[in-house]
Amino acid sequence: MIMLYDNPNKTSHFKPFEELTITDDFMFGVVMSEPSNLKPLLESILNIKIAQIHYPERQKVIDVTYDAKGVRLDVYCEDEKNTVYSIEMQVTDQRNLPKRIRYYHDMIDLNIIDKGENYKELKKSYVIFICCFDPFGTGRYMYTFKRQCQEEPGIFLGDETESIILNVNGSVGNINSELRSTLAYMSGKTPDDGYTKTLDKAVKKVKENEKWRRDYMTFAMKMKESNEVAVLSNIISSIKRVRDKFTEQDMLLIFGLSSEQLSAILETIDANPDMDEWEIANIILFR
């Protein structure tokens, strides 16, 4: 195992547990793991009535889910019509929302196909991001995306996928009063209706729970590890591209690595030619 950073806390920027709000990934996941909290939110976003929702993998609702590309932090549920919903908070603009949305839709479909279902059985799906920023800069509360013909705008593909991005600081567009109050609460304002007061009480209840405090520490540790893997996998990708063009001494300067770190990376690359950067980074950091 090698240390990627001289200061092991360099990638740790997690709030103290007591300071968490509904917009923090962990708190959002815990609060929304209760159907009575999540169902009204989905109903207000989509302007529909949902009879009931359930979580296919209940134990993973607020877990940090690792996959080949990193970490998923979404709340995943289905309703009585087998419609799938993936909803996530996004506090900072990482400028990757379109690709992240595409990836989530793909994962929803692959999860069904991996179980042996025919593609005709693919479920209607919504991927929803609630953002503490305006990704498109128009001031809208909501941006809704469906696949549509460019030549004939009135023709929709009808693949039953829909993507929605919400802006908690929005002021443009017509949304229902319930959703407006919810977005205002998520932007930091005082809860002003029954639902937001329920959410606020749920947040306070989580903070009083020692189990959730311990789980948050585990969550923070896993996120720190994932961040380190992401950084190192990018370095490994770059090293693979340039190692034939530069000396090892040059690469030490280019990538800001120690001799031990660079040697470990090169040795692991050579020993595992079939592994991708993410797998190699995990070996280097945690072997």
Please tell me what each predicted stretch does.
Residues 166:
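Hydrophobic residues at beta-strand termini and immediately following loops
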Residues 169-171, 198:
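C-terminal regulatory or interaction extensions
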